[in-house]
Amino acid sequence: MHKIGFVGCGNMGRAMLSGVLSAGLCESGDIIVSARTQKTLDAVHEEFGVNVASNNGDAAKAEMVILAVKPQMYESVIAEVAPSLSSEAIVVSIAPGKTLSWLAEKTGAKKIVRLMPNTPAAIGCGMTSVAYGDGLDEADKARVMAFVQSFGEGE
């Protein structure tokens, strides 16, 4: 199982991915990424050397799953990833307007986190608001905060 799965890898997903690798949070081989287009997958693989998934469900078979897609795509993407999520997976959403309870209901996950990153994350200087669901223990929260701090500060 991969340590981190990115479902979507646009501007913000790439910023977070770059931070994770630059900070040494994990190796490129520990990360799997899915994207809407093969062009994006090829570019991300070439730039970062990460594993690429043939579908969103494969990217969701990770210890921590980052949902980095546009809010209007959440319904369809969650339908793809929910069956693949491990019962212990930490599901991280960056979509505005999607509450913790909505995410828990739609994904079936126990460990849900909402992040509100900003664009300076692209240069490692982001300030990210973090909201934890009830299912995370202190070790889970520490993992999430280490992830957030790889591309800036978190609170």
Question: In which residue ranges do the predicted regions lie?
Answer:
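NAD(P)+-binding Rossmann beta1-loop-alpha1 motif at the extreme N-terminus of oxidoreductases
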Residues: 1-47, 51-54, 60
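General beta-strand structural signal in soluble alpha/beta enzymes
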Residues: 54, 93-94, 111-117, 154-155
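Active-site capping/gating segments
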Residues: 114-129
